[in-house]
Amino acid sequence: MVLFFRVCSGLSFVFSLLLIVNNMHSLAFIGSVAGIIFSSALVYAQLRLRRTKTYISLVITRKLFDYWPFVMIACFICSRALVEHSPYTMDAILALLWFGIFILKSRTVHYLKNKNLQKYFPDIKPIQKKKIFSLKGKKLRERIKIILTELRNKKTIKEIIKRVLIELLEWVDAAFYAIFFVLLVNIFIFQVYRIPSESMVPEFMIGDTVIGFKTPSGPAFPLSSFRLPRWKNYKRGDIVILNNPNYPDTPKARLKTFMSQLVYMLTLARVNINTDDNGKPKADPLVKRVTGLPGEKLMLVDGVLYVKHRNDTEFLPVEEDSLYANWDLASLPISERRLIKDIYIGSEELRIMEAVESQRKALNLNDAVKQTESLVNRLSLLKGNNDTAAAADFLQEAEYEMSALFRANDTISREILTTNGGLAWFRSFMTSWFPYWQSGDTQQASLYEKRFAQLNALIKLCFGKIVIRNIELFRANATAEQFINDEVRNSLLQEAQTYAFYLAWTNQRNMNVFPAGQDEYIPENAYFMMGDNRFNSTDMRHTTVFKLTSVDKNDAQSIRFLSNIEPKYVPAEKILGTTILRVFPFSRFGAL
């Protein structure tokens, strides 16, 4: 046993001293000193046990060994709290040393248990708890009399106070041990997660409490670059828990996330202290479904997910994605629908979007060219004189945004009519998509790009028709009331509203080829995820910032819309685990 104790003590000191290697900052120093102090206490307790051979010394030694791995991991966390990038080699060494500490602790506590005293410490006899006074076999009146008599005895009072204090300390000890046990479980085995949003409806509803299994995913040693080996290969359709890549990965953020996960699990997912700078709960971690695998390119068009592998010649639909993707929450059974808080797109709105998708798919670009040329010729006749200037710059980039453009349709129409260069601008705007799509060199264009070129042409045709109708009304000296109530104009504006509605939600139904490079594919050990509730899921398709984006990237004067599409894959090390069980509410309890 002496040699065994020396190995434990030496390991503890080595671990504590290594905390400051290549890591000289204040918290690392504090963690190292704390580890050395605890290691010294461990050595002192062992020496006292060997010298006194008393049961009290054994209990103290056993309790210190009980806390040994927990104190060491706390010292490690303290030493890494402000480290931007800790050296992998040192992190790996310390992690392996800690696992050694945990194993040695288990063996040591086993040796120090009461049932093993006779074998390892024959000179030490366990102290049995004595009853302060006995009431066994006494009648109620006699019991009361004995209690009252004993309470007048100062020695008895002291024994009672002593016993109460011991019991309190044991409760505190049990509470701390439970906290540390939960910490280890949360780091290496399970994580409790309470669903905060409806991105995975109908699989998960707001308030569902699920358990994620972390061990197969190779959990990371806290606040370090070291991970246990991953032996889980994710499949399409797996539901995973992952760190949100949209949040900055800073030492402060990592520490806050770590502490919040501990509090979250201790409070059974009732308290979340992981908030952003505005005090709002972070959407972190996320629960999403794996939809893209290593070696794949992805594309989402009209709500259909397509995949292409390196040896494929074309994109093919992912049939199984339709089993998970939900576009029409209103069609769910009433038992599920009543649990949903927000249904952004109902069945009728979905039909409108699908009608736009069918309309743009059916548009022949050659026919669109002819229609566009007809509109330009019609405007030339209406204006009645040829421009003598180049195309006037009527619009700034922001004014090409769909809603802004159509809101200003009457103003733009009047400027086209009255400005020298107005006709030239109209011709330039309406035909700017011609060069690329008439070049014959469009084979490299993706299905997404073709569909959005068709949508861009549809919107421009609609805008051109509105401009023509406005100028016709101007020429006819229509009154304001006639202008506002004109049926042809209002029908075109209604069509424009349909396109605007589609563009407002197109970020959820469409995504261009990802990864974008011709020879780029999702790399090894990386995955792509989306939520099942595609209209209400901010996932790996999206970023947090909306940017003004061209509907047709090959059109210099394209219609613009606000897009937050910026797809990203997630390295396997960012995946925390897979969901295995829904535990609450009990009405939805079940394996996943």
Specify the residue positions occupied by each region the protein language model found.
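Hydrophobic alpha-helical transmembrane segments in integral membrane proteins
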Residues: 184-201, 250
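Internal/C-terminal transmembrane anchor helices
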Residues: 152-191
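Soluble "head" domains of membrane/secretory-pathway proteins
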Residues: 1-168, 203-592
